[in-house]
């Protein structure tokens, strides 16, 4: 979504989606009807109205305005599990692809202040200027893996509490239901080396079935391009009136967890399993 966002540099106008403008710039030969079709797919008009309503909010204020406008009911439990001291990593499953991050920013920004939370995201999302104050870029598309690692390292070495989706991708429908893919071990290793405590977060929500069907058919047809990602903006709009249930689970010392389960991938999988355990 973020690659199709334009923003008035004077910040006298809200962030707005402009599919046709981006296509004219990046692929000038594409017919106008294709641009109009894509604008409908991402629900450009509805998103732009939502962004106008949220303007001029930023950070957690922007996020709360989005949730309020969409009439999202956020039910939170497990607050008592959040430690009062230390630098924390809020590691959550990633069921939605947009509103889950917005909701966590709203909740944790209100609790700690925006200046005390940091959310590593791929550098494309840095186009979402109202959230630049809490985002920090990791170069997912960089030539070298160490560029990505350095962005994460800066986030973990800083003083703020880290919000992260260890899977890196939106949950998919599988034999066990809607579940994250493998949680990358990097978040756990960096939490351990920087002396952080992990707070696993269970985020109960889902996209519409058509999103999961598209992902399944793309995989069956061996299409390498992540087509379903183009439908995530529409899923955000379709969430109007829904209820999200968020549970903060008991904290885990990253260093102690790795000592008990020294294989990093298995240790990351164990924390993922905590999120889905009942």
Explain the meaning of each model-derived region:
Residues 1-88, 99-103, 114, 132:
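Membrane-anchoring hydrophobic helices of lipid-metabolizing enzymes
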Residues 52, 65-70, 138-144, 176-177:
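Short, flexible loop segments at the rims of nucleotide/cofactor-binding pockets, characterized by
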Residues 88-143:
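Catalytic core of membrane glycerolipid acyltransferases/transacylases, capturing the structured
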Residues 94-98, 170-171, 206:
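Gly/Ser/Thr-rich loops at beta-strand to alpha-helix junctions
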Residues 120-122, 165, 201-203:
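Generic beta-sheet signal
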Residues 156-168:
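A structural motif
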Residues 161, 172-258:
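A cross-family acyltransferase "interaction/gating" segment
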Residues 255-278:
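C-terminal/domain-terminus segments
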């Amino acid at each position: 979504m973020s690659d199709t966002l334009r923003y008035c540099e004077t910040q006298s106008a809200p962030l707005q989606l402009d599919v046709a403008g981006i296509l004219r710039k990046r692929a000038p030969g594409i017919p106008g009807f294709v641009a109009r079709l894509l604008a409908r797919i991402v629900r450009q008009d509805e998103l732009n109205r939502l962004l106008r309503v949220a303007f001029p909010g930023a950070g957690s204020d922007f996020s709360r305005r989005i949730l309020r406008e969409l009439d999202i009911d956020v039910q939170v439990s497990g607050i008592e599990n959040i430690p009062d001291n230390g630098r924390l990593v809020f590691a959550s499953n990633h069921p939605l692809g947009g509103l889950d991050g917005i909701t966590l920013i709203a909740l944790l920004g209100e609790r700690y202040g925006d200046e005390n939370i940091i959310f590593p995201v791929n550098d494309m999302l840095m186009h979402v200027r109202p959230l630049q104050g809490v985002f920090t870029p990791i170069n997912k598309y960089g030539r070298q893996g160490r560029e990505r690692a350095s962005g994460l390292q800066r986030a973990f070495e800083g003083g703020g509490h880290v919000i992260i989706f260890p899977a890196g991708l939106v949950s998919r429908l599988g034999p066990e239901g809607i579940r994250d893919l493998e949680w990358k071990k990097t978040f756990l290793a960096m939490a351990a080396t920087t002396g952080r405590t992990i707070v696993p977060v269970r985020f109960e929500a889902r996209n519409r079935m058509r999103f999961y069907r598209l992902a399944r058919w793309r995989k069956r047809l061996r299409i390498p391009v992540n087509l379903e990602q183009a439908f995530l903006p529409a899923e955000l709009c379709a969430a109007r009136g829904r209820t999200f249930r968020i549970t903060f689970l008991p904290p885990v010392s990253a260093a102690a967890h790795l000592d008990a389960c020294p294989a990093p991938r298995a240790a990351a999988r164990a924390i993922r399993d905590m999120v889905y355990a009942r």
